């Protein structure tokens, strides 16, 4: 049996549940992993840098301040993330190239799509706690996402103990 976020909430009441703000854009709707973070506003320089490093099954959480004016993530960075082993991304902002993202074996959650590319000014913070959707996303904590929503735990959940696979 595989996990679902409702099952995780039932079995682990201490998990944080993100407000239901996000849409799935990637080829995977179920994904999980340790969190890495970027805080940026309309500049995806740090996202591009991180996507080109080994993901090791991590989930990149991006606090784009909820901006709907520019896309922070698209097909090129998505392809880099897949090639480097990232499990998924959660973006408090926009994506673009949605037809291509839908074909990638990557979890991609974002607020919306926007065709305008980002500005690149080499700005942003990496591996800092970020807060949005009613949740604190801390580097090293774990994110679990599926079609039901997003939950965050301070440590990996013992899924095998409750008969679930990771």
From Swiss-Prot:
Residues engaged in binding a divalent metal cation: 97
Any one GO BP annotation for this protein: regulation of RNA metabolic process
Top enzyme category: lyase
Top-level taxon in the UniProt lineage: Bacteria
Disulfide pairings: none
CDD domains: RraA_family
Quaternary context: Homotrimer.
Family in the record: Belongs to the class II aldolase/RraA-like family.
Protein name (Swiss-Prot/TrEMBL): Putative 4-hydroxy-4-methyl-2-oxoglutarate aldolase
Species the sequence originates in: Xanthomonas campestris pv. campestris (strain B100)
Lineage: Bacteria, Pseudomonadati, Pseudomonadota, Gammaproteobacteria, Lysobacterales
């Amino acid at each position: 049996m595989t996990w679902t976020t409702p099952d995780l909430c039932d079995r682990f009441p201490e998990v944080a549940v993100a407000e239901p703000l996000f849409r799935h854009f990637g080829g995977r709707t179920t994904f999980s992993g340790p969190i890495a973070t970027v805080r940026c506003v309309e500049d995806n320089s740090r996202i591009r840098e991180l996507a080109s490093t080994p993901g090791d099954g991590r989930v990149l959480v991006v606090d784009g301040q909820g901006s709907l004016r520019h896309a922070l993530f698209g097909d090129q960075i998505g392809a880099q993330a897949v090639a480097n082993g990232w499990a998924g991304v959660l973006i408090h902002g926009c994506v673009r190239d949605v037809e291509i993202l839908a074909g990638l074996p990557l979890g991609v959650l974002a607020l919306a799509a926007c065709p305008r590319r980002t500005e690149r000014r080499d700005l942003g913070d990496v591996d800092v706690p970020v807060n949005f959707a009613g949740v604190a996303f801390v580097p090293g904590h774990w994110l679990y996402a599926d079609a039901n929503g997003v939950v965050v735990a301070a440590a990996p959940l013992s899924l095998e103990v409750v008969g679930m696979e990771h």
